[in-house]
Structures are given as structure tokens and as C-alpha cells.
Amino acid sequence: MTSEIVLIIGAYLLGSIPTGLLLAKAVGVDIRTTGSGNIGATNVYRTLGRRVGIMTLIGDCLKGLIPVLIARHLQLPEIWVAATGLAAFLGHVYTVFLRFKGGKGVATALGVFIGISPLSVLAALAIFVFTLIKWRYVSLASITAAAAIPFLVALIEKKGLLITMSVIIAALVVFKHRENIRRLRSGTENVFKR
């Protein structure tokens, strides 16, 4: 039990590392005061370009993937695997290093689900890409893919604990996009540009 608790705390702290903020500061920019003010990959991409944006995406994704892979490697019961993934995600969304004001969690959730249900991720990515190509809104694509994940996990994994975790993560991703939803409804949301 002690090792499981240590893993969950470690997952939360790893998830809490503000990748986008650190990478932006390395090039002399406080990402919280530019663009949308969000520390996630989309704002970093828009503000600082493709290279730093992709580095942020990969870093945030690894924060979710690594703890889940460790839990899998230790052959922990499903409840601990789910709790570890959720802890990493919550670390990103509510980071202790920034007074619990983190990112929206899309990339970290991606990492968690790559470790838990790769087939669900492939299907969700297809939904994301289709939505992005058709409507050109990253936020809408993220929300749509997040909303689909619980159904995909239920269909593919059929494990109650993983389904519950995916519902919690999806709900928080959508909740963290509430300002984007308002802008989508008012027609003022930023369109994705390559």
C-alpha cells in the first residue's frame, strides 16, 4: 500500500510540472501573460511557434504516460493504475506549483490514455483530426475527443474503474474549456492556423 501511495503522490507531482511555462520561460516569455494565458501546448504553439509547442505537447503527454507505465510495470491492480493516471492528470490541471491553476489537461490526458487504452486513443485521435479539419477549432476538437473517450474506453476496455476514471477526466477537460465553449457559441473563438 505504501508504494502505491508514493506512486500516486509522485504522479501528481510529475503532472504538476508546468512544461509550457518552463519552456516559454527558457526563451524569455511568461506564457501566462501572452495569448490566451493558458500554459498548455495550444497557447504555446500559437505564441512561440511549432517547435516549442510540440515540445510542450510531448512533455505534457509524457507526464500522463510515464506514471501509468510505471503502475503497469509494477503490475498493480486496476484501481491503482486508474488512480495513478488520474493523479497525473489532476497534477497538470491543478498544479501545486502554480497555486492550483494549471492547464486544460488535453495532452496529459492523452498520455494517460495511451498507457491505459491505446486503441481508444487511436479512435479519439481520429475524431479529433476530423473535427479539427472540418471546423478548424482546436478547442472544439479537444472537447469532442474528450467527450468520446469514456464511450471508447467502455467499448474497448470494459473495465468499470477505467470507465469511471475516463468519465472524470473527460468531464474536467470539458469543464476547463468552458471559456472556449462560450467563445464558440459567440463566434469569437480562435480558428486554428498552421
From Swiss-Prot:
Q: Give one GO biological process term.
A: phospholipid biosynthetic process
SMART domains (UniProt xref):
G3P_acyltransf (SM01207)
Q: Mind naming one GO cellular-component term on file for this protein? A: plasma membrane
> Which reaction(s) does the protein catalyse, per the Swiss-Prot or TrEMBL entry?
an acyl phosphate + sn-glycerol 3-phosphate = a 1-acyl-sn-glycero-3-phosphate + phosphate
Q: What is the protein's major site of localization?
A: membrane
Query: What is the enzyme's main class?
Result: transferase
EC number(s) per entry: 2.3.1.275
Which pathway, per its entry? Lipid metabolism; phospholipid metabolism
Keywords carried by this UniProt record:
Cell inner membrane, Cell membrane, Lipid biosynthesis, Lipid metabolism, Membrane, Phospholipid biosynthesis, Phospholipid metabolism, Transferase, Transmembrane, Transmembrane helix
Listed as disulfide-bonded, the cysteine pairs are none
Superkingdom, according to UniProt? Bacteria
Please give one Gene Ontology molecular function term for this protein. acyl-phosphate glycerol-3-phosphate acyltransferase activity
Q: What positions belong to coiled-coil segments?
A: none
- What topology does it adopt in the membrane? Multi-pass membrane protein
Cell location = Cell inner membrane
Q: What InterPro entries is this protein classified in?
A: G3P_acylTferase_PlsY
Fetch the Pfam families from UniProt.
Answer: G3P_acyltransf (PF02660)
- Span-the-membrane segments of this chain are 4-24, 78-98, 110-130, 137-157, 161-181
The function of this protein is:
Catalyzes the transfer of an acyl group from acyl-phosphate (acyl-PO(4)) to glycerol-3-phosphate (G3P) to form lysophosphatidic acid (LPA). This enzyme utilizes acyl-phosphate as fatty acyl donor, but not acyl-CoA or acyl-ACP.
Which family does the record claim for this protein? Belongs to the PlsY family.
* Quaternary structure, from the entry: Probably interacts with PlsX.
Q: Which NCBIfam families match?
A: glycerol-3-phosphate 1-O-acyltransferase PlsY
Q: What protein name applies here? A: Glycerol-3-phosphate acyltransferase
Tell me which species this is from. Geotalea daltonii (strain DSM 22248 / JCM 15807 / FRC-32) (Geobacter daltonii)
Traced from the root, the source organism's taxonomic lineage reads:
Bacteria, Pseudomonadati, Thermodesulfobacteriota, Desulfuromonadia, Geobacterales
